[in-house]
């Protein structure tokens, strides 16, 4: 046994000395003496050595392409010249096969072994796999040999949904090129178009890829023409592939090497690195994902964050392959991660620039904006005792999500909760589902609203996302609401229903153009408040799922908006108040009062349910009283006895109505909130 251990130790020593004397500079290898010398690490090293020794003499068969591509962690850490680095992302609409293509690239380059492979490898959250979407940005470093030259390919995975366009902008800022993946059976979609324009603004080299060519309905020639007409890209050399079947993957890898330019060689300049993502690790603090734009960063360097003006020591740096592999040094053009015992994510904001503390860069990296929440709603725990748990859960989610904003809110009906800001409706759904799934919370959500600007008589401008905080009519001159420009791509058969939908939502028609003979692009300007309900569901329903949409924020416009209050037995119920357009006030008020009449339990007295604008009642329903038969004990006799009993009952009901309070049950609140989401 001792002899066996000695021979293994000698083998490890020989391997380590081989790497130490190699002329090519290496990052950390599994045998590096700089790695942790814990017993577990030694065992792993010995096990790796045994496997290497046992398999070295047995593989005499000709290796396949995947065998040739399969590389160990230490090979992926090999230093390559900056001219052999390629940073790229994948632009695609939802369900056009982006995550499947990313999986195949990881598999073909040997970055992920076949036994570790699972569908949507870069989509770490169960929620991402279930919904088939990418939410959080991921990155992976791949090693690819082309014409006997090793290349380092950094893939930065991006989400495709309109709500997560801020994630896309992070990715594009860290890349030189992009794969434009379009479903060969569906063609160009609206969100793809928006991301392509973002990529063109960033001067990225775009490679068109027509995916799903194995489907019976695939029309690569038609889709190529569509891309040329809509986007203006030359598709004569577009790559035809099927990520699912593995067709055309080698051509894509070769095109990345040949067509995407390498990063600029600026290693001699002062360090500037762009933070494009971060997440919180309970043991190591905030882990920062970054792209080195200028200069070099080494392990142990004292670094400085230019926006937050905080400094730290880089305890650990490395690359994402896609799991973290430690490195000694990262150069200009490379993508990696950093751990520096950062306790607060506010010290390492997304979009911030990392530089050296002793040799600061003159200017931070330009053109980066912080994500702004567009949709707000209240989140309240069903169990009031869970309020601290909800706060902790939101704080943890905020560490990973730069766009999530929240502040405490109190409601007479629902107790303590938070007013939360989101990028859009999908973002709101994802956060709610993660709170319920990952933190075991049961939540009540209020109807989503947007941020209104209120111009007051004294000249102040107040931003208001909560109807209960809206200044009184006598104190304000006007209310402005956010407007968006919406572009819908649809087959020509559904133009009528979609135009009707947009006009019903106070949309202002701008233009319509035919992209191809059968597909049209319709542009409208409409209030964001009209979109935060069921607009997207209606768009899909009226077009039988064929239409897609993309929107961008335009600015604020003055509108005739009013606050609609709900009164129950003469008392206003603030959580049910909402801000609506004057023309829709009656319809919304009528729907809310009718719903409340169905849901509030009957009382011993008559209960009026009213929808009001200020002091004016615009819709009303009455909840009739429960009848108590006070005459049941009277058997004939004098009528005055009956009259006396009825008069006494009427007086009692009158007194009860004056002092009685009507409790609105939780179910009624939830049903009305659901109704508000539908009718607004």
Swiss-Prot record:
Superkingdom per UniProt: Eukaryota
State the disulfide connectivity: none
Enzyme class at the top of the EC tree: hydrolase
Q: Which CDD domains does UniProt cross-reference here?
A: EF4_II, EF4_III, LepA, lepA_C
Gene3D superfamilies per the record? 3.30.70.240, Elongation factor 4, C-terminal domain, Elongation Factor G (Translational Gtpase), domain 3, P-loop containing nucleotide triphosphate hydrolases, Translation factors
Does the keyword Transit peptide belong to this entry? yes
Sorted keywords for this record are:
Chloroplast, GTP-binding, Hydrolase, Nucleotide-binding, Plastid, Protein biosynthesis, Transit peptide
Q: Where does GTP bind?
A: 92-99, 157-161, 211-214
- Residues crossing the lipid bilayer are none
Quote the InterPro entries the UniProt record gives.
EF-4, EFG_III/V, EFG_V-like, EFTu-like_2, G_TR_CS, GUFP, LepA_C_sf, LepA_CTD
Q: Name where it mostly resides.
A: plastid
Q: Which GO terms describe its molecular function?
A: GTP binding; GTPase activity
Segments forming domain tr-type G: 83-264
Compartmental location? Plastid, Chloroplast
User: What PROSITE patterns does this protein's entry cite?
Assistant: G_TR_1, G_TR_2
Q: Name one GO cellular component term.
A: chloroplast
Q: Which Pfam families would you find in this protein's record?
A: EFG_C, GTP_EFTU, GTP_EFTU_D2, LepA_C
Q: Does the keyword Heme apply?
A: no
Query: Known EC number(s)?
Result: 3.6.5.-
Q: Which HAMAP family match?
A: GUFP (MF_03138), LepA (MF_00071)
- UniProt xrefs under PANTHER family: TRANSLATION FACTOR GUF1 HOMOLOG, CHLOROPLASTIC, TRANSLATION FACTOR GUF1-RELATED
Its family? Answer: Belongs to the TRAFAC class translation factor GTPase superfamily. Classic translation factor GTPase family. LepA subfamily.
The protein in question is named Translation factor GUF1 homolog, chloroplastic
Q: Which organism is it from?
A: Vitis vinifera
């Amino acid at each position: 046994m001792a002899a066996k251990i000695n021979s293994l130790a000698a083998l490890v020593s020989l391997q380590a000395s081989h790497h130490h004397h190699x002329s090519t500079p290496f990052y950390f290898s599994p045998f590096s003496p700089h790695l942790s010398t814990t017993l577990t690490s030694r065992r792993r090293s010995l096990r790796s050595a045994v496997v290497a020794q046992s398999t070295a003499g047995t593989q005499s068969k000709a290796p396949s392409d995947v065998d040739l591509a399969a590389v160990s962690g230490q090979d992926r850490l090999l230093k390559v010249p900056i001219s052999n680095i390629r940073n790229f992302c994948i632009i695609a609409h939802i369900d056009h096969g982006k995550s499947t293509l990313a999986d195949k690239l990881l598999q073909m380059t040997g970055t992920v072994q076949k036994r570790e492979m699972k569908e949507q490898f870069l989509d770490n959250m169960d929620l991402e796999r279930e919904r088939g979407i990418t939410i959080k940005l991921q990155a992976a470093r791949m090693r690819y040999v082309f014409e006997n030259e090793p290349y380092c390919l950094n893939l930065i995975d991006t989400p495709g949904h309109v709500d997560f366009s801020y994630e896309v902008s992070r990715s594009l800022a860290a890349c030189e090129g992009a794969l434009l993946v379009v479903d060969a059976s569906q063609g160009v979609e609206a969100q793809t178009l928006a991301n392509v324009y973002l990529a063109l603004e960033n001067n990225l080299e775009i490679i068109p890829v027509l995916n799903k060519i194995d489907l019976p309905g695939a029309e690569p020639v038609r889709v190529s023409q569509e891309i040329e007409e809509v986007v203006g890209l030359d598709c004569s050399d577009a790559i035809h592939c099927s990520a699912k079947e593995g067709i055309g993957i080698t051509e894509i890898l070769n095109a990345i090497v040949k067509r995407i330019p390498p990063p600029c060689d600026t290693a001699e300049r002062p360090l500037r690195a762009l933070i494009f993502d971060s997440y919180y690790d309970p043991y190591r603090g905030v882990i920062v994902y970054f792209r080195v734009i200028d200069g070099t960063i080494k392990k142990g360097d004292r670094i400085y964050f230019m926006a937050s003006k905080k400094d730290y020591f880089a305890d650990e740096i490395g690359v994402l392959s896609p799991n973290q592999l430690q490195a000694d040094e990262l150069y200009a053009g490379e993508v990696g991660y950093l751990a520096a015992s950062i306790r607060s994510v506010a010290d390492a904001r997304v979009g911030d620039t990392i530089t050296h503390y002793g040799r600061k860069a003159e200017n931070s990296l330009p053109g980066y904006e912080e994500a702004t929440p567009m949709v707000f709603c209240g989140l309240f725990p069903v169990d009031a005792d869970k309020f601290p748990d909800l706060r902790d859960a939101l704080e943890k989610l905020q560490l990973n999500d730069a766009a999530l904003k929240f502040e405490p809110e109190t409601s007479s009906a629902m107790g303590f909760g938070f007013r939360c800001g989101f990028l859009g409706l999908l973002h709101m759904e994802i956060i709610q589902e993660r709170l319920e799934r990952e933190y075991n919370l049961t939540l009540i959500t209020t109807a989503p609203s947007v941020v209104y600007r209120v111009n007051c008589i004294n000249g102040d401008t107040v931003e208001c996302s909560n109807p209960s905080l809206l200044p009184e009519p006598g104190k304000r001159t006007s209310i402005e609401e956010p407007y968006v420009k919406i572009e819908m791509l649809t087959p020509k058969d559904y133009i009528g229903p979609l135009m009707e939908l947009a006009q019903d939502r106070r949309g202002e028609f701008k233009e319509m153009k035919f992209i191809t003979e059968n597909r049209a692009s319709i542009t409208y300007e409409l209030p964001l408040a009209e979109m935060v309900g069921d607009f997207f569901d209606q768009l899909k329903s009226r077009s039988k799922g064929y239409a897609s949409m993309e929107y961008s924020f335009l600015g604020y416009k003055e509108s005739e908006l009013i606050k609609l209050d709900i009164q129950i037995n003469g008392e206003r119920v603030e959580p049910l108040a909402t801000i609506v357009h004057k023309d829709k006030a009656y319809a919304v008020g009528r729907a809310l009062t009718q719903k409340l009449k169905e849901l509030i339990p009957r009382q011993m007295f008559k209960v009026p349910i009213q929808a009001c604008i200020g002091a004016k009642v615009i819709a009303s329903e009455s909840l009739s009283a429960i009848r108590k038969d006070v005459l049941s004990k009277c058997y004939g006799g004098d009528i005055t006895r009956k009259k006396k009993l009825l008069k006494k009952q009427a007086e009692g009901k009158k007194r009860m109505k004056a002092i009685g309070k009507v409790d609105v049950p939780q179910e009624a609140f939830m049903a009305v909130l659901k109704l508000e989401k539908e009718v607004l």
